[in-house]
Amino acid sequence: MSTSRTVDRAFETALYDTGDDALDTAASLLAADPAADAELLARGEEFVATAWRRGWQPADLVRIVRRELDDVHVRMVAALIRAQAPHDRPRGPRWAAQLDAVPDQAPPRTDRFSHATDVLRLYRLLLRLPALEPLDDAPGAPRREARPESRALARIRALLAKAEATGYPEEAEALSAKAQELMARHSVDEALLAARAQGSAVSPDTPGACRIGVEPPYEQAKAVLLDAVADANHCGAVWNEPFGFSTVVGFEADLEAVELLYTSLLVQAETAMTKAEAGQRAGGRKRTKTFRQSFLAAYAHRAATRLRAAAEAATAESAATGAAADANLLPVLASREVAVTERLERLFPETTTTRLRGVSDAAGWTEGTRAADDAHVERRRPLR
């Protein structure tokens, strides 16, 4: 039997079945034919390339494998992604950053049967991946070029790092507010620069999109927090619960702000929740999943109010004073808002709303609101 035929038979036996017996039979075929290894790797690279054509990106693939399978499969898919990359078409800077973040640990050495079983489990998952909304540029379209980080972003990142590190709630609150203020001003500056490059009040720039992981537990509350951060920074977000991410649409500077701020606020929220639980236990009250869900829901609700207020105040100040004082500012911002909405509606013509479940613990809500009032609004390293 040829090597290619061995792999074909193994795939026919295992990939279109869900049972362990089929998996064992197929793994035995592959284990008995060492010459099939190269063909098996080539087929895996083809599965990865197919995932790219169906709208998936490197971070998405790693995320779904980590969510559905085990660490060995994460290492395997990471190796496939790296092996396929030299054969891929040119991509943008966000894609390149995701490739850089792909885990680089080699899969563990096991016996041939166990290895074949793990490979087939991974390929089963890759084969069943549905199409996602395409976020990157179409082949042949002008590519977005990577830009050096601006001084404003570097300053925001430093503020957020301080906010996460401080043990003083009042300091964290002040740092967070300052970070959101700087984000809003940076967004205004970027909008005006783009419009002036075109010589009109309508920016020539176009909205981009990225996916940000929304990991368990308490995904609903985290998705609400991400939506609040996106809204405060002139972006829109749509949560995909089954695959554990939200798609955020906006202009590049605003997407960077959302990634940084959401990551930082999540760190601050989880730190504050741990402290609040310790305080409740010291008072003799047992804390539960409901407490944590209520805490994070209240945190997201209150953070949304604070972020929106800080962003609106900074934008209003920029419109009236300083280098951003420009008659074109309001038309520019309005045109960008329309562009974001249109891109969001093209990507997601049908969306639904969902009610936040499990928010019934008054102590959790109170503690979460207090923690959001104390949160810093600064930035960290972006999620890709």
Describe these PLM feature segments.
Residues 143-165, 173:
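Intrinsically disordered, low-complexity linker/loop segments enriched in Gly/Pro
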Residues 1-148, 188-384:
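Extended, helix-rich structural scaffolds rather than catalytic motifs
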Residues 156, 160, 172-186, 296-303:
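Short amphipathic alpha-helical coiled-coil/interface segments
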